[in-house]
Swiss-Prot record:
GO cellular component terms, A-Z: nucleus
Gene that produces this protein: Lbx2
Observed phenotype of the null mutant: Mice are healthy and fertile and do not display any abnormal phenotype.
UniProt function note: Transcription factor.
Keywords in alphabetical order: DNA-binding, Homeobox, Nucleus, Transcription, Transcription regulation
DNA-binding region, residue range(s): 84-143
Subcellular location: Nucleus
Ranges of Acidic residues composition bias in the record: 186-195
Protein source organism: Mus musculus
Protein name stated in the entry: Transcription factor LBX2
Induction: By PAX3 which regulates its expression.
Region Disordered, annotated ranges: 1-89, 164-195
Length: 195
C-alpha cells in the first residue's frame, strides 16, 4: 500500500526534492503501468498527472510522443536565461511637472499628441504611454480611497446627510451661469442633525 501511495502522489517529498536529496527505499515493488481498469477516471487522472508533471521532475525527460518540445534548460531555481527587464525610468522633475500638467487637462492622449509630448520631453513614446496608464490607475485608486473615506465618515454620523464630495461622472462639468444664486447653498433645512 505504501508503494501505491508513492506512485500516485507527484507531490511527495521524493518527487519534489529529487532522488539525490531523499534516500531510496530498499526495494519497492513496481506497479504495472495499467491498472485493473485502464478506462477508470482514476487511471486517466494519474496518466494526465504523470504527463503534466513529467517535465517538472528533475530526473524525468519529456517523451517525444507527447507532442511537446523538450525544454532547452532544465527547470529549477536560477535555470534558464531570462530576458532582462528594462530598468525603471527616472523622470526628471521637469518631465513629471509637464506630464502632470497635461494629465490635469487630458487623461487620454491622441497618438499625435502623445508623439509631440514625448518629443518635447525627450522621452520615448512608450514611456509616455506607460506614464499615463500608471497615472490613470493612481487616480482611480485615489478616487476610490476618497469615496471610501467619505462613506466611512457618513457611517460615523448617521444623523447628518452626506452629499458626495466627489464629482459624479453623470453630472455636467459646467454648472451653468455663475452668480450668487448659482452656487449650492446649504441651509438649516438641508442638514438634519439629531439633537
Amino acid at each position: 500500500m505504501n508503494s501505491v501511495h508513492q506512485r500516485r502522489t507527484p507531490f511527495s517529498i521524493a518527487d519534489i526534492l529529487g532522488p539525490s536529496m531523499v534516500p531510496e527505499a530498499p526495494s519497492a515493488p513496481q506497479l504495472p503501468e495499467a491498472g485493473p481498469d485502464p478506462a477508470s477516471p482514476l487511471c486517466a487522472l494519474e496518466e494526465l498527472a504523470s504527463k503534466t508533471f513529467l517535465g517538472h521532475s528533475p530526473r524525468a525527460t519529456p517523451q517525444p510522443s507527447e507532442g511537446r518540445a523538450a525544454p532547452e534548460a532544465p527547470p529549477g531555481p536560477g535555470a534558464g536565461v531570462r530576458r532582462r527587464r528594462k530598468s525603471r525610468t527616472a523622470f526628471t522633475a521637469q518631465q513629471v511637472l509637464e506630464l502632470e500638467r497635461r494629465f490635469v487637462f487630458q487623461k487620454y492622449l491622441a497618438p499625435s499628441e502623445r508623439d509631440g509630448l514625448a518629443a518635447r520631453l525627450g522621452l520615448a513614446n512608450a514611456q509616455v504611454v506607460t506614464w499615463f496608464q500608471n497615472r490613470r490607475a493612481k487616480l482611480k485608486r485615489d478616487v476610490e480611497e476618497m469615496r471610501a473615506d467619505v462613506a466611512s465618515l457618513c457611517g460615523l454620523s448617521p444623523g447628518v446627510l452626506c452629499y458626495p464630495a466627489l464629482p459624479d461622472s453623470t453630472s455636467s462639468p459646467d454648472p451653468g451661469p455663475s452668480g450668487p444664486d448659482s452656487e449650492p447653498n446649504l441651509s438649516d433645512e438641508e442638514i438634519q442633525v439629531d439633537d
